[in-house]
């Protein structure tokens, strides 16, 4: 007899726009919601609380992390809710672990939470070092990996993170969900890693991650 299917919805780049809550069909019955970053736009007072409550009312099982457009108070809030994923690891199911790293490399816009490639790489390595044994691994990272289908801006330039790409090449997580580059939603592969950028949540894009009979699968939805 087949095991029950467990499902997680991964999305990001909410930017305080909550229309996605009503257009993602699986949101209520999913085993959890994973948010890769950019919950707010510069984190004005009350913004993260409003986004949290709107999602929580649909599904209270949330893991989330800071993006480059969020300020440090977002991480403080998520830690208070025991939902922070940035620089953390969690076990979603037996043998299935997730690790998260938020922020982004520097942008031309001087957004609140940017770090160097070196720092991003250190964070990835340090977080992975805490993860322990696993059978399959999900990486939730705000910045998309460099030189993929997921990091191309309108002029055709690749603007993703080399550190993220290097980490994926080295560790080969089974599933990677990124974001940050709104106009480059899609999926790609790096080695055996399947990598996804669902785009802005307000566009209805998300990644449906499923676990059935011990096997992780993922599919880009809503794009």
Segments predicted by a language model, with ranges:
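Binuclear metal-dependent phosphoesterase catalytic core
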Residues: 2-5, 91-94, 115, 162-170, ...
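Short hydrophobic-aromatic micro-motifs
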Residues: 9-10, 96-101, 195-197
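Active-site neighborhood of phospho(di)ester-bond hydrolases with catalytic His/Asp-centered motifs
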Residues: 10-12, 33-38, 62-68, 84-86, ...
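Active-site environment of divalent metal-dependent phosphoester hydrolases
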Residues: 15-21, 40-45, 68-75, 105-110, ...
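Conserved catalytic scaffold of divalent metal-dependent phosphoesterases
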Residues: 16, 70-163, 222
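Short amphipathic alpha-helical segments and helix-helix/interface helices
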Residues: 21-25, 48-56, 74-75, 128, ...
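Short, well-ordered alpha-helix to beta-strand connector turns
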Residues: 30, 59, 81-82, 134, ...
């Amino acid at each position: 007899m087949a095991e029950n299917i467990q499902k997680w919805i991964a999305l990001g780049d909410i930017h305080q726009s909550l229309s996605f809550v009503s257009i993602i069909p699986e949101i209520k019955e999913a085993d959890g919601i994973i948010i890769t970053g950019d919950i707010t736009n510069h984190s004005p007072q009350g913004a993260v609380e409003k986004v949290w409550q709107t999602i929580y009312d649909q599904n209270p099982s949330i893991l989330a992390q800071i993006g480059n457009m969020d300020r440090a108070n977002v991480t403080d809030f998520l830690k208070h809710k025991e939902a922070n994923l940035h620089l953390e690891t969690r076990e979603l199911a037996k043998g299935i672990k997730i690790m998260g790293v938020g922020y982004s490399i520097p942008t031309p816009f001087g957004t609140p939470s940017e770090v160097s490639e070196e720092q991003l790489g250190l964070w990835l390595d340090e977080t992975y070092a805490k993860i322990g044994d696993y059978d399959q691994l999900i990486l939730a990272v705000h910045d998309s990996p460099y030189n993929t289908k997921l990091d191309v801006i309108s002029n055709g330039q690749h603007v993703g993170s080399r550190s993220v790409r290097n980490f994926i090449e080295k560790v080969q997580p089974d599933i990677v969900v990124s974001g940050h580059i709104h106009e480059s939603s899609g999926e790609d592969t790096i080695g055996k890693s399947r990598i996804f950028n669902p785009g802005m949540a307000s566009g209805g894009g998300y990644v449906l991650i499923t676990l059935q009979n011990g096997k992780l699968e993922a599919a880009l939805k809503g794009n």
